[in-house]
Amino acid sequence: MTFLTRNFYSSLFLAISDFVSFTLSIYVAKILLSFMLKEFDDYIPAQHVTALVLLHWTLAFCCVGWFSIRLRHYYYRKTFWFELKEILRTLVIFAVIEIAVMAFAEWNFSRYMWILTWLLVLIFVPCARMMTKRVLTVLGIWQRDAIIIGTGKNAHEAYKAIQSEKNLGLNVTGFISSELTDKPGDSIDGIPIIFCDDLWLLTPCDKKTQFIVAVEAHQSDIRNYWLRVFMIHGYRYVSVIPTLRGMPLDSTDMSFIFSHEVMILRVHQNLAKWSSRLLKRAFDIVASLGIIAILSPLLLYISFKVRKDGGPAIYGHERIGKGGRPFKCLKFRSMVINSKEVLEELLANNPEARAEWDETFKLKNDPRITRIGHLLRKTSMDELPQLFNVLKGEMSLVGPRPIINAELERYSDEVDYYLLSKPGMTGLWQVSGRSDVDYETRVYLDAWYVKNWSMWNDIAILFKTVSVVLRKDGAY
């Protein structure tokens, strides 16, 4: 199957799935309401129901057109959470348009039907889009070969990022050498390093291959050379991943100055805005209260079971909060009463345990943990009392990993980012492997979170946390 054929089928199937899931929602809503409310069919005149269905179909066509022409969802590859944000934002706008049209037309419509219809739309469309891409991937239609220009640190990071984002559908088949230390036969994660010049592009390489230029900051000559070659030979699918390590990327605005090769990036520190902090705090209060209310029977049951092992059910361990202020981080007790003595004896007699503790402040096979403590830690239920830390304003639902005072030094320059935000019950570290992640990566993830905070990122992390907890990834 040619590239153009695969592209056509991908775009067609994605558009059909969006349209079908969009229109299907109103029929499902009508069936559910007819089943739940016996007099529903008599409440709205038949002609108004028909008009509403026609309006919904019209908006479905418009929505698919918007996804295609304005957002280019059927042609450009975008990351999952970025694409999902654009989908939900678009659907909310179309929901407002629909109710506005019905209000101005003075139709006799059911608010229940409108609410249920659009709740289903917000669920059906993203789910159908995701399922369609999975089917296209299984059929071998969604994938696109990609070649990375560069073999330095930036190219390695680009490769890891692409591998972690399956929604892009990119299959990296090679790296084009950019380093003097590269030798024939070298590879990166089993992918060969290619030594070539622009003549190589004239024969064996498909013009539809995705090229990603990811050279180092000091290799601008190499970058410009390849961009010129791609333009001359008519290669359209070319992306550049510049070296932006350490920069805040979320909500960054880009502009350029006419007739100059100067790009201006306006960076934002979202957590510095009072409106962002107010939104985050309001979300923390509402969500934590709701979770406590729902889980209160479970909290009481766990407290009872922990007390049966002797000692208090909840303990507070000192952690460093926003601005360097210490606070008692609450947890269900998962260790024996004399845990301090047990740890000291273990570290004194076991060099391997000492090395592991000095590296991560954790032990994979910790003898201090009680029988029920193993279950609580595996399921992360030992951290549920931190909901009360969130209510008190000492923590947030999402944030950097709470650390002890001794760890501040290990954060080095990144400690300033840690101190800008409240520690979180969950965060990037928790959804990126937790205890299986090395300490340097933990620090990087905490700093990345603070620099790139947004409410949408918090919501994404919360959804990913549910998946991680259910799979028990990196928990011990």
Question: What are the residue ranges of the model-derived segments?
Answer:
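Residue-level signature of catalytic and energy-coupling elements of molecular machines
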Residues: 150, 211, 238, 297, ...
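Acyl-group handling in specialized metabolite and lipid biosynthesis
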Residues: 273, 447-450
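A hydrophobic, helix-centered structural microdomain
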Residues: 275-342, 461-476
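Signature of alpha-helical transmembrane segments in polytopic membrane proteins
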Residues: 1-141, 170, 280, 476
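N-terminal hydrophobic signal-anchor/signal peptide
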Residues: 1-21, 25, 77-79, 127-293
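Short, glycine-rich, amphipathic interfacial segments at transmembrane boundaries or analogous
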Residues: 245-247, 251-255, 314-367, 426-444
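A short, structured surface patch at a secondary-structure boundary
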Residues: 356-422, 461-469
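Membrane-cytosol interface motif
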Residues: 86-87, 91, 142-159, 312-335
